[in-house]
Amino acid sequence: MNFTKTDFVISMGMTIAVIFMSFTFPALGMTGDSVQENEIPEFNITKGSADFAREQPEYPARPSEGTLTYKNNSANWADGRQTYLQKGDTEYLVSFFDNSDNQNPPEWKLNLIKFNSSGSYSESTIITEGESKTLTSADGSYEIGFNNLEIEDSAVGNETASVDWKVLEQPSDSTWIGRLPVVGGLISGANQLASVVGWIGAIIWHFVVQILVTIGNTLLIFYNIFVYFLEFMYWITTAYSGVVAGAPTAWASVIVAIPGILLGFEFVKLVALAISLLPLT
């Protein structure tokens, strides 16, 4: 048994005829009830799909220098006006922004902030072109130097500038064993290595989860298409049955039913062919 080109043409033609009659005949008042828009199954290919909103784990190294850039009206701080020096239970952050509240000339402000469960502690200073400034965190752990302020635009609403920063002092291992010569370096190196290994594991898991979510969403797309096909077939069968039943005469019902009968034969043939291809038959 084969599903030939002729079978395909008949199936497509009769499907179009059934859909056409189901929509147009009632609308023209020839037979059946008019199709209501809210009765048509809604197709949502992404129904039930999962969102992958996890951020990629950051490398655990402590940055030692860089450039902060401020651009007024930039979205979500995407211009790079802040940088985390350290993340974890206690976090340190440097930030750079215009403190003049849209006044001209701008007043460029630097912040060094410490966050932990007890609260936040901020040290700040104003910097102008040609100046070098230093900020020390509230607990004395970090000392940051700032220089090379470059102002690209001072116009109100378009303030844009950048400044270079560099870590002059940063936290070290505070335990007595961590301060021992050689041993302290080994422990610090081991801790850093463990952090990097953990980061590699987190990166691998991040991509594994992303792949699993992608595969799951792809399978869900095919499932949604299949379910919609069944829902649409049920709806169109119901609508078409109403068209056939509402024909004004018996002969009209027979004529209107011909496309559905032919389509039914082709569908049965297709199902029989699919069953014959199963490995157990």
Curated annotation (Swiss-Prot):
Residues 8-28, 196-216, 219-239, 255-275 are annotated as: Hydrophobic. Keywords: Virion. The keyword Hydrolase does not apply. Its main location: virion. It is found in: Virion. GO terms for cellular component: virion component. The virion does not contain any lipid membrane. It comes from the Viruses. This is Structural protein 26.
